[in-house]
């Protein structure tokens, strides 16, 4: 289970020194649009939409913007009604590191072209669908924060149908489950008094590539920064592991 948190830990540590924190308004709004389009445009009845709205509010996106995004997804907005779809792209970074990119786009050709340029300029290459996804498993993950009694967390996790959990920090834990059980697990944890700060689908690497070369590490983080900076990109996942010391040198 330790492998679950390697990429998640890298992302958390990287966020501390990143100039940009979290997602842009554009990326968060698109998540709402896609969620509203893929289900009913009512957050009370659409878990994906409810989660997207919670993330937008946490990023201080105004309610007017949130309502506009819901209307766009529902097709009831009077202005621009561009149709966004969720697409997964796959490729390799420097040293053969596997990279998955989840995107929300209204123009597949534009997104693919932007990604291809990002990869080629940073020592990687955009591959075909399926070239690296077999190295990952998709899971539902609930992030729990606050003072955590591990015994109580174990009991609540079992009750909620979790597969495993991991204490990641003094006051943070991640609980893993099948993607179809994420909403039920999140609700069970909340009912048991836990503060669930995020509930998301996450790609978990089945194995990790150890990165020890400083130049490779810098190239990897530059590539990931470039990919994450694209408006169409929602999330980037990679299957490498790195020491905290080398990571600090690579992203400073």
Swiss-Prot record:
Any single GO BP term: regulation of DNA-templated transcription
Keyword set includes Transcription: yes
Gene3D superfamilies attached to this UniProt entry: 1.10.10.200, 3.30.70.980
GO cellular component, one term: cytosol
One Pfam family from the record: Transcrip_reg
Top-level taxon of origin: Bacteria
Entry keyword annotation includes Thylakoid: no
UniProt GO molecular function: DNA binding
Location(s), subcellular: Cytoplasm
InterPro entries xref list: Integrase-like_N, TACO1_YebC-like_2nd/3rd_dom, TACO1_YebC_N, Transcrip_reg_TACO1-like, Transcrip_reg_TACO1-like_dom3, YebC-like
Assigned keywords, A-Z: Cytoplasm, DNA-binding, Transcription, Transcription regulation
NCBIfam families assigned: PRK00110.1, PRK12378.1, YebC/PmpR family DNA-binding transcriptional regulator
Family: Belongs to the TACO1 family.
Protein name (record): Probable transcriptional regulatory protein Npun_R5651
Species this chain originates from: Nostoc punctiforme (strain ATCC 29133 / PCC 73102)
């Amino acid at each position: 289970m330790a492998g679950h948190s390697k990429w998640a830990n890298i992302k958390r540590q990287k966020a501390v020194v990143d100039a940009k924190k979290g997602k842009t308004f554009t990326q968060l709004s698109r998540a709402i649009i896609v969620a509203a389009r893929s289900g009913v445009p009512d957050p009370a009845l659409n878990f994906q939409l409810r989660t997207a709205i919670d993330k937008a509010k946490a990023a201080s996106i105004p309610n007017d913007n949130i309502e506009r995004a819901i209307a766009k997804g529902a097709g009831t907005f009077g202005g621009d009604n561009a149709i966004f779809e969720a697409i997964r792209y796959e490729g390799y970074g420097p040293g053969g590191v596997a990279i998955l990119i989840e995107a929300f786009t209204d123009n597949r050709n534009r997104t693919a072209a932007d990604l291809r340029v990002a990869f080629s300029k940073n020592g990687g290459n955009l591959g075909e669908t399926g070239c690296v996804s077999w190295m990952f498993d998709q899971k539902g993950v609930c992030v729990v924060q606050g003072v955590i009694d591990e015994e109580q967390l174990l009991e609540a996790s079992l009750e909620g149908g979790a597969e495993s959990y991991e204490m990641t920090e003094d006051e943070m834990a991640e609980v893993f489950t099948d993607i179809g059980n994420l909403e039920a697990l999140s609700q069970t944890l909340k009912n048991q008094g836990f503060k669930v700060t995020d509930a998301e689908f996450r790609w978990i690497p089945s194995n990790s590539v150890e990165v020890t070369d400083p130049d490779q590490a810098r190239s990897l983080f530059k590539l990931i920064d470039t990919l994450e900076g694209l408006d169409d990109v929602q999330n980037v996942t990679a299957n490498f592991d790195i020491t905290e010391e080398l990571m600090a040198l690579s992203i400073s």
